Amino acid sequence: GDVNQNSDIDIIFFHKIPTYKIDFILNQNNYENYRRELIMATPGDSIKLYIYLNELTAITIPLTKLYKTSLEFYDFGGKINYEKLIKNERVPGIDKRLVLITPLPKGHEERSILNNESIAAKKVGVSIDTINERKRVLLRREEHGRTGVFLKRELSLEESPEAVLTKLARENSIIRKKIN
């Protein structure tokens, strides 16, 4: 809805793919100075590989199954597929301020989701539970700042994400259960 030159871009794969394929494509396209990290926000969340191409562009690859809440997280923010992107289509989404941004033919409309949760849920196509969960997290973050994550492991470009994850699973039963 309110995409501009300084907007961040998150590219997400919704199914597991071998990470070496992404590394290969990046190398073929002369991306050399990118950062990678394994992230598991909470013990109940999926484990993902984040590849940061620059300050505004990230690629997310799930290394374990994405659950409904993880999938709806992307709808919440305004998920768009490649075909719609090529056609310059825009979709509604909710930002970190808890503002629903609805694209208009020219510009966009902004509306707080507070006390408008069911309207927001319908607009972005998620459950009311997802709206309430994201609202809880973002309001807590506003009050207390960003809290820690369960797993955050920076990777060198030489490390295989899958090999590091296997090693971490040997040391941690929660991670072990996720990858099995």
Q: What do these predicted regions represent?
A:
Residues 2-6, 15-180:
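Catalytic core of pol beta-like nucleotidyltransferases
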